[in-house]
Amino acid sequence: MQQCQICNCIEDFDLVEDNKIIGLPSEMQGSFIEFKGKNNIIFFDESVALEDTTVRFFGDNNVVFFSSGGRYKIRAKVDVFNNSVFYMGKNCDTTRVIRAVLSEGKHIIIGNDCLFSFGIWFRNYDPHLIYDGSSMERINMSKSVFVGDHVWIGQDAFVSKGTKIGSGAIVGAKCVTGGRILNSNCSYAGVPGKAVRENIFWLRPCVHSYKQAQTKSSMCYKNKEFIYSNDENCLSFDTIDKEIDRLLSSEERFDYLKKTIFENDNKNRFYVHNEQTKLNLLSRIFRRNNEASPPLIETLSDFWLIC
């Protein structure tokens, strides 16, 4: 059995065997890293500060990658098992602890400049096996999760396996993403998450302490820096997923992440637009408009979705 190695402070890093720590966090307040496997890599970019953070490697050949820290210290509980990648981009802010569990060799990739509220969970798997009763084949395979750049995820949201979120999107409080494709510059809410507004963008300033003058000055913002579009620099989440799976060692995967994502500053790299999202919303509305006396709860639901 692989010996458990625990790092409660930076001084413990030199004692780690059969695993690799690259870089040093500037702080490790109430945090620790635990290794119960081998050939794992954890990377800390400059200015990464940890608070109430735990990273636990329960298996082999994983990569955990923390890019440069944001306004706040990183607060995260990350559990990885075998052959998975957890990547957090530059200048991401965690208001409180986010939780991520990675299983069955699948991954969680988070872009730059993301904002996370309270009580957020990321999972790329179902905990137990589910089978089709006729074919007797498994139907709940684990799937990677991708979050683009400048994504705001609200309180108690649950980002489930197979979810792909485009840059500039908003995931509302208590939303369950349901493994869906969430378009860039759209706002999503509900269970499962549905588009409630298209063609939006969001800014970081918090309105808590705003007075009348600040509210007035915030009413128009003409810079289009957070509006994303399709161009030749767009990356495919599916291609990234397949390439990470193709690479056999944690060293190869680390090099791929560094070159393809960490060193890539193209604005539109994680732009996502899935026409089916819009078509699904419109089809639900038109279908019910053609029905006689649709149930009240469905009518109200459709009204809420398009407001």
Question: Which role fits each region the language model picked out?
Answer:
Residues 24, 126, 293-294:
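Intrinsic-disorder/low-complexity coil detector
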